[in-house]
From Swiss-Prot:
Biological process according to GO: DNA repair; positive regulation of transforming growth factor beta receptor signaling pathway; protein ubiquitination; ubiquitin-dependent protein catabolic process
Region of interest called Ubiquitin binding, as start-end residue ranges on this chain: 836-838, 886-890
Descriptive protein name: E3 ubiquitin-protein ligase arkadia-A
Extent of motif SUMO interaction motif 3 (SIM): 321-325
Length: 923
């Protein structure tokens, strides 16, 4: 402990200064993902490096999170933390715009809550640094959840300049550190089964938050509430739960040094290894932990905010994760035993999430990989696994995004199946399943979004929503995603765009999936993923749960991503946002707030990868109905997103749709309408782009909304639409899509009731937008099968995308032929009148022969050309008696040859003199 303490103090000093750099340590979230059940979701916003390196910083930052309700920078950092818990979410949300009443009300909710707030305020870290996920987790962990599971709305910590924690806090941290270390060591020994310790296995989720850099990070996410004595969800750990999950490939082993520092109300995350810190150093907000917690956070997560300390190397996708998590609200932690099985995939997802920015695509791939593993796990575990899967996806994604794309399709399928299996499955497995696709799209997109949002507004992973909680608790820990996504924390309005993104992930299983992608607020992945996941959750779980989680994720994403991919997010917004409001209208509002602030950050993420955001898939729509109720809140964000994403319309389209979705959920129909307009504009922009690349449009048929959305919006970027569209529900969705398009209500096929009101004005535009940007180009191939799409494409820009070209082109050709013959060609009568046809006769045959002979005698070889004439059209020598035609220019050709030429061109083939210009010389 002393060693750790010393190291932590040393590293903390360094980390405090290099919060951003430390962000990269989030990669440990891969392992963290293993604890999918643990609702602890770290957002990509959280930087693993920051988390680890910021052990002290984390602690301080936790205070900050509490004290900085409206600090964009803090929001970014806290964004990841928020995902871990409502408290985190509030602190995390801390997005400037997102101040939550709960934050203020809940400071006293739990003992740690107040100290935490105070310490957070004392610290006041700049969120822009994107505090490490761990730190975020530490700061706004469960204590809030335990007390009230603060909604996103409650203000997070205000930025506090002081980054030093009081002596008392330090002592507490040391005690907690020792305690956690013991627990961690114990669990470390139990690595294989550590996942089973259901103590808020946020470690996996935290792992997700950890940066996706290659570094292995250990996320220690001690719940300050744990210190308060809140019973651990899964109990073996008293105040703090230290879950060290070792994936098949333990990440921590290499970096065994695990420094966990936490004060009673604050948790400090100590970098497990230098690598981890470097990750944190990266300073890229990660939404990984959001992913991780998504699955991991089951109903428990929903019902409780938890402070988690996750010690987990992010670098290695599969790594032990030390999850110190306590849900103040829900002492019981969903066991992550099954999740443990999923630990590696989760780790990957975590990594993926952390890499969301840079490894968005990878994320998808990893997710895809993780997904396969998840299916094996039992339903209950599925939630955890889903979380793990997300984490895993993140991790894998960090390693390679490409795989995600293939996974994406599989994810979609799983989406469909998982949705059916059980809430837990839906939230967990489907999330994982869908997560990869979203991860894939969104990773690019999401990655960008996340990146974008983070810079401007660190993602606030813990964006739990108490509302979400309700939905989240639907059936088993629909977990991971649902419980963690739906966590009150998730709904932190403060979670800025990024925060919201993460929140979405955390809020519900659906969102959880989305979160991984959605970590990048603007990232289509984020939104997209959330969408996909949300759809599953909504579909199979309770729409409420899915919607709740989804909404959070969507909303969270919407805020940050809109700028990145306004259209995409918008599209998603309809789907995602709508579900979100159900449980989190405030969240929606936060999105709006976030949207306002995030627009600047999102622009950076024009992530073609986001294309894969296909995850937006109509799944989002499923939750939409619930979302619609709360949608009115975020009208502003849509515009921001749209404007921000306007430029990278294609990529942003998906993200934008998602974002839009989120916003819409937050925003009301008004926002939806606004989005619709924005979307239409963007669609037009995209369309123009697409017009430039008509072939692509033809290449990409939009089989279903999934494809039509992020991917399709991004279509020209990723073009994984085929793969993605190969999702099992592609067929059904496609029909739904067609119906929606035909009816003009994009959401109609996917949801009914309120959604229509909100979505009708907005949704159709997003869809149209997608169609135009991604779908039109994509749809051109099968446009014949989708007349409504064709109409949309033609209606959007006032002309048919395909028909006009076809008809006009043919007409032009015919016209050219007609005009060409008249203008350029000559009639047979004109030819006969202007030329001199006759039988060829070698006039100078004798002379030529004599000359030839003479030349030979002189030893000079006379060229035959001099003695013989050739038809320059057929290049044959003119023979005696052949029908030839002499033109006014005196050039001689075979009649057959020259007549064919003159029919198309009245000019001499040799000198280009018009036969009409001179009188024929018939002599």
């Amino acid at each position: 402990v002393e060693m750790i303490a010393s190291k932590v103090s040393n590293e903390f000093n360094h980390l405090c200064s290099d919060t951003n750099k430390q962000q990269s340590d989030l990669n440990s979230n891969g392992t963290e993902q293993d604890k999918s059940l643990v609702v602890h979701k770290k957002r990509k916003s959280q930087q693993a490096g920051t988390s680890y390196a910021q052990s002290c910083e984390v602690k301080e930052y936790q205070r900050l999170l509490r004290l900085q309700p409206k600090s964009d920078e803090d929001n970014d950092s806290s964004f990841s933390d928020c995902i871990s818990s409502p408290s985190s979410s509030s602190h995390f949300g801390d997005s400037d715009t997102m101040t939550s009443d709960e934050d203020k009300d809940n400071p006293l909710s739990s003992v740690n809550s107040t100290p935490r707030t105070q310490s957070a305020r004392a610290q006041k870290w700049p969120r822009p640094h994107t505090d490490s996920v761990s730190s975020l987790l530490m700061k706004r962990p469960c204590y809030q959840v335990s007390s009230l599971r603060r909604p996103l709305h409650r203000k997070r910590f205000v930025k506090n300049v002081s980054s030093q924690r009081t002596q008392k806090q330090k002592e507490r941290i040391m005690l907690q550190r020792k305690k956690r270390e013991v627990l961690a060591r114990q669990k470390y020994a139990l690595l294989p089964s550590s996942s089973s310790s259901s103590e808020n296995d946020l470690s996996s989720e935290s792992s997700s938050s950890s940066s996706t850099e290659g570094e292995e990070d250990l996320f220690v996410s001690p719940g300050e509430n744990h210190q308060d004595g809140t019973t651990l969800p899964s109990g073996g750990m008293d105040e703090d739960v230290v879950v060290i999950e070792a994936s098949s490939t333990p990440q921590v082993t290499a970096n065994e040094e695990i420094n966990v520092t936490s004060t009673d109300s604050e948790v400090e995350i100590v970098t497990v290894g230098e690598t981890y810190r470097s990750r944190a150093t990266l300073g890229h907000p990660r939404s990984h932990w959001g992913q991780n917690s998504q699955s991991g956070r089951t109903q428990e997560q929903r019902t409780r905010n938890r402070v988690s300390t996750i010690i987990q190397p992010l670098r290695q996708n599969t790594t032990e994760v030390v999850d110190l998590t306590v849900d103040e609200d829900d002492p019981t932690v969903v066991p992550t035993t099954s999740g443990r099985v999923e630990s590696q995939p989760v780790s990957i997802v975590s990594s993926l999430t952390s890499t969301s920015e840079p490894a968005s695509d990878s994320m998808s791939g990893l997710m895809g990989s993780a997904v396969p593993e998840i299916p094996a796990i039992p339903p209950n575990t599925v939630g955890t696994i889903a979380d793990d899967s997300r984490t895993c996806t993140s991790g894998a994604n960090a390693d390679g995004g490409p795989p995600a794309m293939p996974r994406l399709p599989s994810c979609c399928p799983q989406h469909s199946p998982c949705g059916g299996s059980s809430q837990n499955h839906v939230l967990g497995h489907p999330h994982s399943s869908c997560f990869p696709p979203h991860s894939h799209h969104f990773p690019h997109h999401h990655h960008h979004h996340h990146h974008s949002s983070h810079p401007g507004v660190p993602l606030s992973p813990s964006f739990r929503d108490s509302h979400c909680t309700v939905e989240r608790n639907a059936a088993v820990p629909p977990p991971c995603g649902v419980s963690s996504s739906s966590g009150s924390t998730y709904h932190d309005p403060q979670a800025l765009p990024v925060d919201l993104s993460n929140n979405g992930i955390r809020s519900h299983g659906s969102v959880g999936f989305h979160s991984t992608s959605a970590f990048d607020p603007c990232c289509p992945g984020s939104s997209s993923r959330s969408t996909v996941y949300g759809h599953q959750a909504t579909t199979s779980t309770a729409q409420t749960m899915a919607i709740d989680g989804y909404g959070s994720s969507m909303v969270a994403q919407a805020q940050p991503p809109p700028p990145l991919s306004s259209c995409r997010h918008y599209m998603h917004a309809s789907y995602t946002s709508l579900p979100r409001p159900l449980h989190h209208q405030t969240s929606s509002c936060p999105h709006s707030n976030s949207a306002s602030q995030p627009p600047p950050p999102p622009p950076p993420p024009p992530p073609p990868p986001m294309d894969y955001v296909i995850a937006h898939q109509v799944p989002f729509i499923s939750p939409l109905p619930s979302l619609t109720s709360t949608h009115a809140v975020p009208p502003p964000p849509p515009s921001h997103h749209l404007s921000a994403a306007a430029a990278p319309l294609p990529q942003h389209l998906s993200t934008s749709h998602q974002s839009m979705s989120h916003h819409i959920s937050a925003t009301a129909p008004a926002t939806q309408r606004l989005h619709a307009h924005e979307v239409i504009q963007r669609m037009e922009v995209q369309r123009r782009r697409m017009m430039q690349h008509p072939t692509r449009a033809h290449e990409r048929p939009p089989p279903h909304p999934h494809r039509m959305h992020p991917n399709y919006g991004h279509g020209h970027h990723i073009h994984v639409p085929q793969t993605m569209s190969s999702h099992p529900r592609q067929g059904p969705e496609r029909s739904a899509w067609e119906i929606a398009i035909e009816t003009g209500v994009t959401a109609a096929p996917y949801q009914t009731g309120p959604l229509h009101t909100h979505l009708a004005p907005y949704h159709p535009p997003p869809r149209l937008h997608h169609l135009q940007i991604g779908a039109l180009p994509l749809m051109v191939p099968d446009m014949a099968g989708y007349p409504h799409i064709r109409y949309i494409s033609s209606g959007l820009d006032g002309r048919s995308f395909r028909v006009p070209f076809r008809g006009n082109f043919e007409e032009l050709i015919h016209l050219e032929e007609r005009l060409g013959n008249v203008n350029r060609g000559a009639s047979q009568g004109t030819i006969e009148r202007c030329t001199y046809p006759h039988k060829y006769k070698k006039v100078s045959t004798d002379w030529f022969s004599q000359r030839k002979l003479h030349s030979k005698q002189d030893g000079e070889e006379a060229p035959e050309e001099d003695t013989e004439e050739k038809c320059t059209i057929c290049l044959s020598i003119l023979e005696e008696g052949e029908d030839v035609r002499r033109l006014p220019c005196m050039h001689l050709f075979h009649q057959v040859c020259v007549d064919q030429w003159l029919i198309t061109n009245k000019k001499c083939p040799i000198c280009r003199v018009d036969i009409d210009t001179q009188l024929p010389t018939e002599s």
